[in-house]
């Protein structure tokens, strides 16, 4: 059987706890008590000498102690029935045939129902506000810049841009080999500009810089005066 001593009756100080001092009957009728439906059921069972009460007995106890519930009975009575059915701390006890008069089964506390004590603090049957638990931070994923590899952090884009030209000159894998030199029979266009025939055949780019004598004769200096060692290097 459930030990009713765990729920001292003197903790149900209805008149003092439910309403402010000096409250009128009208205020009590309009003010909803600060008790949950589970607490109201527990109070009704606790006040019974046998430790059990019928559903109608629960209704009578609530309306007798709390005038607020005397109106709109259908709504809160449905809530009482739902809490009795869904809460494992309340069990239904059938009537004994031939020995008890009346209708309906009894309701009492389930044996070893210590979890009901956790619903209230120090015998206080008032409503408890829901406490918000600490926010749990999910596992942090890789940042937008890319995950850090085992070899170390990746270099910033600016550094990669500076290193790209140097690494290209070192012969990265997959690059094509350098072009082979032109055969000796064909002169490279760059070498052609420095040949003697090209210099003699091209017009003078700076005719104003010629000496007066050469400008009048329209001739070029002799080839032996030209430093040919520039083309033999």
UniProtKB/Swiss-Prot annotation:
Residues 185-194 have a biased composition (Basic and acidic residues). It is found in: Nucleus. Pfam families: Forkhead. Residues 125-198 are annotated as: Disordered. One of its GO terms (molecular function) is DNA-binding transcription factor activity, RNA polymerase II-specific. SUPFAM superfamilies: Winged helix' DNA-binding domain (SSF46785). The keyword tRNA processing does not apply. Its main location: nucleus. One of its GO terms (cellular component) is nucleus. Residues 32-130 bind DNA. InterPro entries: Fork_head_dom, FOX_domain-containing, TF_fork_head_CS_2, WH-like_DNA-bd_sf, WH_DNA-bd_sf. GO terms for biological process: anatomical structure morphogenesis; cell differentiation; regulation of transcription by RNA polymerase II. Residues 175-184 have a biased composition (Pro residues). Residues 125-134 have a biased composition (Basic residues). The keyword Cytoplasm does not apply. Keywords: DNA-binding, Nucleus, Transcription. Probable transcriptional regulator. This is Forkhead box protein L3. It comes from Homo sapiens (Human). The gene is FOXL3.
